[in-house]
Amino acid sequence: MGLLDQKFDKGGVVITAAENVLNWARLSSLWPMGFGLACCAIEMMATNASNYDLERFGIFPRSSPRQSDLMIVAGTVTFKMAERVVRLYEQMPEPRYVLSMGSCSNCGGPYWEHGYHVVKGVDRIIPVDVYVPGCPPRPEALIGGLMKVQELIREEKFAGDRREAIERLKPKKVKAEDVIVETSASAKKLQEAAS
């Protein structure tokens, strides 16, 4: 017996908004692309193992950005790697989401104060939707972050001009030199505040 063989109390019609159906389909088939850069990647790989079974949430990891709708940035993002992170993000189709996993990708981690080579948070180069704290976060925390992304998708509205929203979400072109100048300026402020 299937669902359509059963009688409905008030007729045989189900009414809902089209955006609810689209959001349900997108959140039930989330395809993340893992971008593992350091020790957080080990925990991300553990999350993909059979102990946690991400497929029960409809999450199927992909290795190509062109097939992914979620980028998981796990680990330390250096200035050399920042350009590649932006390039992969730009190759992802819309709508796209970013999950920042671990202290290093959230805010620079232990390299925050003295690491001249580390981006002080991946949100300086691409927009981040969900942050997962920890050093490194446990697989359970990553699963919680993935469920938070699914909640964001469930509540998304398509009303209004979508092109304007897409333009607002597009990352600005960032060069490593600009971030280095900004970082050195903030380092000077920290030194002045310490003295």
From Swiss-Prot:
What InterPro entries does this protein map onto? NADH_UbQ_OxRdtase-like_20kDa, NADH_UQ_OxRdtase_20Kd_su
Q: How is the cofactor bound?
A: Binds 1 [4Fe-4S] cluster.
Q: Does the keyword NAD apply?
A: yes
What's any GO biological process attached to this entry? electron transport coupled proton transport
| EC number assigned by the record | 7.1.1.-
Q: Write down the chemical reaction(s) this protein catalyses.
A: a quinone + NADH + 5 H(+)(in) = a quinol + NAD(+) + 4 H(+)(out)
Query: Which keywords belong to this entry?
Result: 4Fe-4S, Cell inner membrane, Cell membrane, Iron, Iron-sulfur, Membrane, Metal-binding, NAD, Quinone, Translocase, Transport
- From the Swiss-Prot or TrEMBL record, state where the protein is found: Cell inner membrane
Positions with a binding annotation for [4Fe-4S] cluster:
C39, C40, C104, C135
Q: What is a single molecular function from GO for this protein? A: 4 iron, 4 sulfur cluster binding
Where this protein primarily resides, as one coarse class? membrane
Tell me the cofactors it needs: [4Fe-4S] cluster
| Gene Ontology CC annotations of this record | plasma membrane; respiratory chain complex I
* Functional summary from the UniProt entry: NDH-1 shuttles electrons from NADH, via FMN and iron-sulfur (Fe-S) centers, to quinones in the respiratory chain. The immediate electron acceptor for the enzyme in this species is believed to be a menaquinone. Couples the redox reaction to proton translocation (for every two electrons transferred, four hydrogen ions are translocated across the cytoplasmic membrane), and thus conserves the redox energy in a proton gradient.
Q: What family does the entry list?
A: Belongs to the complex I 20 kDa subunit family.
Subunit: NDH-1 is composed of 14 different subunits. Subunits NuoB, C, D, E, F, and G constitute the peripheral sector of the complex.
The cross-references to HAMAP family, in alphabetical order and at most eight, read: NDH1_NuoB
Protein name as it appears in the record = NADH-quinone oxidoreductase subunit B 2
